[in-house]
From Swiss-Prot:
Record note on quaternary structure: Homodimer. Interacts with IKBKE, TBK1 and TICAM1. Interacts with TAX1BP1. Interacts with CALCOCO2.
Region spans: Disordered: 345-365
Residue positions, PTM Phosphoserine: 318, 353
Subcellular location: Cytoplasm
Annotated region (Interaction with TBK1 and IKBKE), positions in chain: 216-257
Function: Adapter protein which binds TBK1 and IKBKE playing a role in antiviral innate immunity. Activates serine/threonine-protein kinase TBK1 and facilitates its oligomerization. Enhances the phosphorylation of NF-kappa-B p65 subunit RELA by TBK1. Promotes TBK1-induced as well as TNF-alpha or PMA-induced activation of NF-kappa-B. Participates in IFNB promoter activation via TICAM1.
One Pfam family recorded for the sequence: TBD
Designated name of the protein: 5-azacytidine-induced protein 2
The entry's keywords: Coiled coil, Cytoplasm, Phosphoprotein, Ubl conjugation
Recorded GO CC terms: cytoplasm
Species of provenance: Pongo abelii
Coiled-coil region list: 40-76, 102-135, 166-196
Region of interest called Homodimerization, as start-end residue ranges on this chain: 1-197
Domain of life, source organism: Eukaryota
Length: 392
């Protein structure tokens, strides 16, 4: 618009210059033509000048309106931007504040939970320690009971073993009776054969001798089985009585003696018993002190249990001494060398195995009849079994 205003000014100034020039015009044209052209130019100039003024007014109005609109638009834009920014800032601030509050709450809850967990863990540890201490006592009691049970088996096992041994002894006694009956029947048949037919006497003698040798072998085997069972039963009862006596004495002097030494003596004595197929061996050693030396006991009066044990040992020894040798067709059967000695002083019993057929001449044919061995009476075996049961 300034350029247009300047153009208008230039036009007006140019018009003024033309007016100055037209003061003293030189009449080129003549007469009416010059006047008409001059009048047309003046009217055109006036018209153009009026248009320029109108356009300048419109221009100024438009400029004002544009400035007003620009200011209005800028104010509106500032208001919009300021309101949006404030709202966003407010929202962000509120969100940050809420997050901070949540963080503080969670932190306080976490601290509280950690504190509760530490306290509960401490309480649980104390309870666990107390329970472990409570469990240690019954565990030690159970272990001691197991050790005592291993050292001293229950009486029910001994009773079962004794019953089984009694049944075996009864069966062997019945077999022995049957063998005796067969032997007597064979003797009767032999006498009848001698009276009836002297020609067949030799054949019958050989057959009878073979039968008698077999029957005597079976009878002797049954006798030695019975003897072995009796000796094993006697030895088991003796060891049990000794163990019970030691337990009684150990409980009586429990405060004066250490329990470890007593248990070791019982374990050592219980391990010295060996029951085998044909022999039974028991060896007792003197107790060992904690220093490794054998303890010396002063002479004292024997207990009632010892008197019973010695009396039964004397009975069994006399019985075995009477049965040391079994005559068989003129030959004597020699037992084990350690069987005849006095074994009550050194506390060791060794029973020999039954004789074999190769050691004695059972299969030889002889003209003489075989005498029966001197077997112990049955009432003595019953009495010995009763004594063992009473002792147990």
């Amino acid at each position: 618009m300034d350029a247009l205003v300047e153009d208008d000014i230039c036009i007006l100034n140019h018009e003024k210059a033309h007016k100055r020039d037209t003061v003293t015009p030189v009449s080129i044209y003549s007469g009416d033509e010059s006047v008409a052209s001059h009048f047309a130019l003046v009217t055109a100039y006036e018209d153009i000048k009026k248009r320029l003024k109108d356009s300048e007014k419109e221009n100024s109005l438009l400029k004002k309106r544009i400035r007003f609109l620009e200011e209005k638009l800028i104010a509106r834009f500032d208001e919009e931007t300021s309101s949006v920014g404030r709202e966003q800032v407010n929202k962000a601030y509120h969100a940050y504040r809420e997050v901070c509050i949540d963080r503080d709450n969670l932190k306080s809850k976490l601290d509280k939970m950690n504190k509760d967990n530490s306290e509960s863990l401490k309480v649980l540890n104390e309870q666990l320690q107390s329970k472990e201490v409570e469990l240690l006592q019954p565990r030690t009691e159970v272990e001691t009971q197991q050790v005592m049970r291993n050292l001293n088996p229950p009486s029910s096992n001994w009773e079962v073993e004794k019953l089984s041994c009694d049944l075996k002894i009864h069966g062997l006694e019945q077999e022995l009776e049957l063998m005796r009956k067969e032997c007597s029947d064979l003797k009767i048949e032999l006498q009848k054969a001698k009276q009836t037919d002297p020609y067949q006497e030799d054949n019958l003698k050989s057959r009878d001798l073979q039968k008698l040798s077999i029957s005597s072998d079976n009878m002797q085997h049954a006798y030695w089985e019975l003897k072995r069972e009796m000796s094993n039963l006697h030895l088991v009862t003796q060891v049990q009585a000794e163990l019970l006596r030691k337990l009684k004495t150990s409980t009586a002097i429990k405060k004066a003696c250490a329990p470890v030494g007593c248990s070791e003596d019982l374990g050592r004595d219980s391990t010295k018993l060996h029951l085998m197929n044909f022999t039974a061996t028991y060896t007792r050693h003197p107790p060992v002190s904690p220093n490794g030396k054998a303890l010396c006991h002063t002479a004292s009066s024997p207990l009632p249990g010892d008197v019973k044990v010695l009396s039964e040992k004397a009975i069994l020894q006399s019985w075995t001494d009477n049965e040391r040798s079994i005559p068989n067709d003129g030959t004597c059967f020699q037992e084990h060398s350690s069987y005849g000695r006095n074994s009550l002083e050194d506390n060791s019993w060794v029973f020999p195995s039954p004789p074999k057929s190769s050691e004695t001449a059972f299969g030889e044919t002889k003209t003489k009849t075989l005498p029966l061995p001197n077997l112990p009476p049955l009432h003595y075996l019953d009495q010995h079994n009763q004594n063992c049961l009473y002792k147990n």
